[in-house]
Amino acid sequence: MTEKTYREALTDALFLEMRRDENVFIMGEDVVGGTGSPHAEPGFVGGVFGVTGGLHEEFGLERCIDMPISEAGIAGTAAGAALAGKRPVAEIMFCDFMGLCLDQLMNQAAKFRYMFGGKATCPMVLRTTYGAGMNAASQHSQSLHPLVTAIPGLKVAMPSTPADAKGLLSTAIRDDDPVIFFEHKTLYTISGDVPDGEHLVPFGKARMVSEGDDCTLVATGRMVSFCENAAQALADDGITCDIIDPRTTSPLDEDAILDSVEKTGRLVVVDETPPRCSFASDIADLAAGEVFSSLKAPIKQITGPHSPVPFAKELEGEFVPSPTKIRDAVSEVVNFK
């Protein structure tokens, strides 16, 4: 184990997978130069958040490709390369701009295997950032994972720790289906122990962050640590929680969630997207439909409001679920009569 940041863990996975398989290559806006730096300039960034830094020095510009500012072109080129036998890892800087490449993802990459009767695969990864917390305003702060989770044929990964960032990205690159890989912008600098060498985390297998008896908390990405903070405060009141990080929203580890809710009898789902058609509503529907008789209290969903993400720091702070809101929701369901 080595302590690494979330960003370093992702970079580590890219180095390992590109060394392992010459068909793996990266592409996207400024994935080589970053912030407009010339390729040969020392200290270049490598992508807007520095994840691809250093890759071109080992693998060259044929496998590290800076692309024009065209999300449709990036996603379409990646899908075509995947059909031809390559394993592209494409980067869309912010998930807010995925609308510009929805046809390539929704009608092309997601459908190839089905439309060709299982004879074609599309082993591409589309890395993108999401989430509020950096005062980046409404066009650079959205969380659009529910949008692509709803599309059959796409797999969706959302690591919350450096170890899972490395393990899930390696798994995504080796997968024969298209994977949308969401990286929360506020997590790049967090640190944690990361396995050395090859590390694979299976899709569809949730992580049990902590165990308790009184309530089940389900969250992804940044919201996992918020749940941990809330659980620590709740422990002072004698309330203990299962915290489940699904890791992937598609495929989803339904059994882990349902088994926990059957045990605790209470469920709080935390997601920073707006409430309508959200990850939170999806999990709430799953539990209500499958383990309703085990519930001791109404299911609570802690989400952002049905609103664009505000720019003002104070308003953005109110938009995002907080440990305090989570703690209050758990207290409410535990004390429900």
Q: What is each PLM-predicted segment?
A:
Residues 28-30, 67-69, 92-93, 128-130, ...:
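Fold-independent oxyanion-binding glycine-rich loops
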Residues 1-178, 185-337:
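Thiamine diphosphate
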Residues 178-180, 239:
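Short, structured loop/turn "capping" segments at alpha-beta junctions
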Residues 97, 102, 110-114, 147-148, ...:
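Broad hydrophobic/π-residue packing in well-ordered secondary structure
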